[in-house]
């Protein structure tokens, strides 16, 4: 190998190494076991417990009342990037709504990408209500469905098993949001954000009467 080739190879390896190190520094993998103790997390209207489901350790949120609930990750300000997690709801019609909140300001002001597992069954999935984006407090699911039908919710093809964990990857590059389910190459939902907020908290979100399980939360902060 001549000197010039050695220089180019060394430079290329240095760049790759630097990129990998930089990427690792921007990856956050929160410890979900700390949700139970409240260390670095703040839980609203839910009772968390650690359980093992199908061999996987996860946090289970019990619905003690009919109000919505959320677990806020403290001390992380998320702007753009990727949020991944494994979620499990229930195949119970009208009683399972869970997802990932971001752009969180307080307990009533945030954006959410959430899922309706009871709509994963084929006869319901075709109606286009399996995955939804909302922006509270102004843009509720009802307002968006009424004023922008089919724009902020969609089917998932192929749909996950409503009684099992499913993997979610949410790519956020303001104003664009893309939602991928179970390693699919094509997004199940693509929308433009409705809020003008930048940054904010990330949370594990459940609507009213919803119990939920969450595992393997991973956050990749985009380079600013």
Mark where each language-model region is.
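Bacterial N-terminal signal peptides that target proteins for export
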Residues: 1-11
């Amino acid at each position: 190998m001549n000197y010039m080739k050695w220089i180019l190879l060394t430079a290329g390896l240095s760049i790759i190494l630097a990129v990998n190190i930089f990427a690792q520094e921007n990856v956050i993998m929160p410890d979900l076991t700390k949700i139970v103790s409240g260390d670095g997390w703040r839980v609203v209207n839910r009772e968390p417990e650690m359980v093992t489901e199908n061999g996987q350790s996860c946090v289970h949120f019990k619905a003690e009342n009919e109000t919505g609930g959320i677990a806020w990750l403290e001390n992380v300000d998320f702007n753009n990037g990727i949020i991944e997690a494994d979620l499990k709801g229930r195949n119970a019609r009208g009683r399972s709504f869970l997802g990932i909140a971001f752009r969180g300001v307080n307990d009533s002001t945030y954006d959410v990408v959430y899922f309706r597992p009871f709509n994963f069954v084929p006869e319901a999935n075709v109606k286009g209500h399996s995955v939804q984006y909302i922006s509270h407090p102004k843009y509720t699911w009802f307002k968006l469905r009424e004023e922008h039908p089919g724009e902020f919710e969609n089917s998932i093809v192929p749909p996950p098993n409503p009684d099992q964990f499913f993997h979610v990857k949410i790519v956020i590059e303001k104003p664009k949001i893309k939602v991928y389910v179970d390693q699919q190459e094509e997004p199940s939902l693509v929308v433009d954000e409705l809020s003008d907020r930048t940054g904010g908290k990330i949370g594990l979100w459940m609507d009213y009467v919803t119990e939920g399980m969450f595992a393997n939360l991973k956050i990749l902060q985009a380079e600013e």
